[in-house]
Design a protein with these regions (language model features):
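Amphipathic alpha-helical segments used for helix-helix packing
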Residues: 117-140, 318-338, 375-379, 386
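Conserved small-residue-rich
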Residues: 181, 221-290, 378, 382-385
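An amphipathic alpha-helix adjacent to DNA-recognition modules
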Residues: 27-35, 47-48, 68-92, 111, ...
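Helix-turn-helix
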Residues: 32, 36, 40-78, 245-276, ...
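Actinobacteria-biased recognition of intrinsically disordered, low-complexity terminal regions
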Residues: 1-28, 214-215, 225-228, 408-410
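Hydrophobic/aromatic-rich alpha-helical bundle segments in the mid-to-C-terminal region
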Residues: 139, 160-203, 210-223, 344, ...
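Amphipathic alpha-helical packing segments from all-alpha helical-bundle domains
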Residues: 136-161, 170-171, 338-362, 371-372
């Protein structure tokens, strides 16, 4: 028995009181709270997290947490605007680089933006997908910060490529920001320096893309769903509402009304509830992506050809179902847990198949690196879509080119 053990035993026998543990408040408590809340919000969504959840994760009481922040919203708002501000500072060009060559200036801005994104990866998730739950004035501030980032990128891209029209510069900058912040859409891991190198290379390839003329795409008209196909009509209307207002802000009653049903109870003849509708939508999106891989590979002459086919199919499918594409990125945390496991496996396998093709084309990259690039390519569709909607500047043909630049390299 050790000396320490003997002392402990004596105290137990004699009844000597144990020394009181003094817990001191860490000097960086607010930073700890910010990091913990960002991880929680990023994983479960703003509506899926309570102050009690955050306090428990920190090992403190709710009362202690409320001494730092008066509400969950205050915590959420401060963290999003903090990172938005950090991103705007990152793209500010130092005075000593004002006369540097255009490429050097762009590389500096990219390096700083990528570093800031990596450092704040969990909160960047919130900036990308949960910012819509900010109050209008706060959302305007966040959007203003993001526009500042895009303008700063635009200044450097325009200097590098003065022949580009202003709209085309904006397209390339949206694509660059999308590729950089796409690391917030997944949990794949790589060393920081590797991520920096990979994203810098992808962003540089995007900046060099020769965009075709902006021509409106002839998208197929939405298929009319007969009233007798209520299960399909419910699914479409639910996705449209989730896209417009966010899953937590949509009720079963509203879905029923949109689908022309007389009462919410009628929905339950087709689906067990709102979460079942969301899960069905996610399965459809996941199956569309995973089901395309095998036929594309079988019909192609090589991996590059298969990748070209998959890019075209992915973009066409996403443009045909814009609302579903957005919902797939924003509402995953609201899918029932058992469905999330299945969907994660489907998505992981789909990404692995794409990544394998990319590695065939670019054997100098590791499997982990190609997975990062696949996620960056996927992000182009949703980010160009929400930035330009039906504007020809963000046409399917252009999105395909941007995806190719990321996956095939410059």
């Amino acid at each position: 028995m050790s000396v320490d053990n003997r002392r402990s035993t004596r105290k137990a026998v004699t009844g000597d009181p144990a020394p009181r543990e003094i817990r001191r408040r860490p000097k960086n408590r607010r930073a700890q709270i910010a990091a913990t809340s960002a991880a929680a919000f990023g994983s479960l969504g703003y509506h899926g997290v309570s102050m009690e959840d955050i306090a428990t994760a920190l090992g403190i009481s709710s009362a202690a947490l409320y001494r730092h922040y008066p509400s969950k919203y205050a915590l959420f708002q401060e963290e999003l605007l903090r990172v938005g501000s950090a991103m705007t500072e990152a793209v500010r060009l130092p005075a000593d680089l004002a006369d540097a060559p255009p490429r050097a200036r762009l590389e500096h801005v990219l390096e700083a933006l990528i570093s800031t994104t990596i450092e704040n990866r969990p909160t960047v998730t919130l900036v990308r997908w949960e910012g819509r739950y900010l109050a209008p004035d706060d959302l305007a501030l966040l959007n203003g910060q993001q526009m500042t980032v895009l303008r700063a990128l635009g200044t450097q891209v325009a200097a590098l490529r003065p022949e580009l029209a202003e709209t085309d510069v904006r397209v390339l900058c949206v694509a660059i920001l999308s590729a950089v912040t796409s690391i917030a859409d997944h949990h794949a891991a790589l060393p920081v320096k590797t991520i920096q190198r990979l994203l810098t290379s992808a962003a540089t390839a995007i900046a060099a893309v020769e965009l075709p003329p902006a021509v409106a795409a002839e998208l197929p008209a939405p298929v009319e769903i007969p009233d007798s196909f209520k299960h399909e009509l419910l699914l479409r209307k639910a996705v449209e509402l989730f896209h417009a207002r966010g899953y937590p802000n949509v009720s079963v009653e509203e879905i029923a009304t949109a689908a022309g049903l007389s009462a919410a109870s009628a929905v339950y003849r087709f689906y067990r509830g709102k979460s079942d509708l969301l899960a069905a939508a996610f399965r459809r999106a996941a199956d569309r992506v995973s089901g395309a891989v095998g036929p594309a590979v079988a019909a192609s002459t090589d991996s590059a050809d298969a990748l070209e086919t998959l890019i075209r199919q992915y973009v066409a499918g996403s443009f045909a179902e814009r609302a579903l594409t957005f919902v797939y990125y924003t509402e995953f945390q609201h899918v029932p847990a058992e469905e999330r496991t299945v969907l994660r496996n489907i998505q992981r396998l789909s990404v692995e198949e794409w990544a394998r093709l990319v590695r065939d084309v670019r054997p100098e990259l590791s499997s982990a690196e190609t997975r990062f690039l696949v996620h960056a390519a996927f992000a182009q569709v949703v980010d160009l879509g929400r930035a330009f909607d039906t504007d020809p500047a963000g046409s399917p043909e252009r999105v395909c080119l941007l995806m190719r630049a990321i996956l095939f390299g410059s």
